[in-house]
Amino acid sequence: MSTPTILSILLPTRGRREMLKRSIESLINTASTPGRLEILLGIDEDDEGLTEYLKDEIAPMLLEKQVECRANLFKPLGYENLHQYVNHLAGTATGEWLVFWNDDGIMLTDGWDDEIDKRTGQFKLLAFKDNHNGHPYSIFPILPKDWYNLMDHLSMNAQNDAWLSHIAYMLDIFERIDAEFLHDRADLTGNNDDETFQNRKYQEGNPEDPNDFGHPDMQHARVRSVNKIAWYLKKIGQPSEWWDNVLAGKQDPFEKMKANTSAGVEGAGQFAANDPTGKKSRETKKISDDAKLVL
């Protein structure tokens, strides 16, 4: 009998002890093989009481299901540096797949881990179904560890879902799978309108800011990532004809992302989802035409 594919769960958390327990519980109770899960927590050193809560309330639940969990302690970086948390966690992962997860996420689908495992060996960005009402992104991205091994990072911006989804759409390696979660977030469900939610700082929507998702340097960085991944895809026998056509001027890189965007989309990331190249924002902000997507 073959050894189950390990799935590494990347889970930064702050100030949400009970929510964290509920979120993890939903993952392990719905997994076909919970023992294949490797939960990697990113916790701030000043998150009072969390370490004790993990030992007293969460560890026994994990031991019962034989789920490995490792907590990585950080000096507080803030939401605007969320990518630094997940980049570090990814570097410590031993699984074949990296699965982004949130402490306000609730897994709804039994056997969700099997849906990921079906794609093992494929270099794709996978997406769960969600309650964002037609958002085109992979809100909690799922990707092979080889992505990190190749790039030495997952994202260079706190909007990790946007960063990875844009790259995947440009290469036509985005796939939504038959597994669903509930994002139990204040702007979506009315729940958990807490300090953690209120203190979020988005690096998106102001492309004049060098740290913004839409800044020209950030767009150039994503295109460099696309070119590197396209090279790798050819090496493994999975060439991206889509990207070749983009480079030849025959294909809109974001055609499928636009087609997957509902008019009623809810949640963060709407700026980039509905304006993937930042053109509208450039017109509004009157910044240089250099901010366009450069291929």
Residue locations for each model-derived region?
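Short, acidic, metal-binding catalytic loop of nucleotide-sugar glycosyltransferases
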Residues: 25-36
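Short beta-strand-to-loop element that shapes/binds the nucleotide-sugar donor at the catalytic cleft/hinge
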Residues: 124-141
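Active-site nucleotide-sugar/metal-binding loop of Leloir-type enzymes
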Residues: 86-97
